[in-house]
Amino acid sequence: DIVVLEDNPYRELRFSGTATDSFGKELGEQCCMLGTFSKIVAPGMRIGWVCVRNKALREKLLSYKATADLHTNIFSQLVLAQYLADNDIDAHIEKTKVLYKHKAELMMDCMRKYLPEGVEFTPTEGGMFLWAKLPNGMSAVDLYRVALTKGVAICPGDPFYEKARNVSTFRINYSNSSDEVIEKGIRLLGEACEELLAK
């Protein structure tokens, strides 16, 4: 028996394109679905959820969870429960998707405008990040260092690969920045890319 672990923390934040079905619909007891409130309610609210139909698997997960950290922060759970009782979470998610779509489109427009030729990015249909790629042979860790001197933070792709180091991919977040900060940040990131390309 194989259990499929479906980890889709950005599922609710898809703002364009075609929504994807959960594996859980097809796989039933063979699927374990994970989700989080940190992406849809508040980043500091490090509370997630697990949906498992298989009773034996659920019992094992509960046992592992209990030994991993004894228990999840009770106060945070109570605050979240009260928030969910007092607010329409679906309306909140819809509002967030509209905001994130605007920010993502602005960031992509700025990337087209300010990033030098050879730097590519993957258009997004949801979530809170954009992925970009430097020309082959260039390290996103090097870009991170140059960009940081300009006050711009990116996340090099290295932690997202099992063994690769000094990869050319990097991730940038648009969820918590104003329009002005997004434009200024991407302009400065473009300058950092130019400096790196000139070396």
Spans of features found by a protein language model:
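PLP-dependent class I/II
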Residues: D1-K199
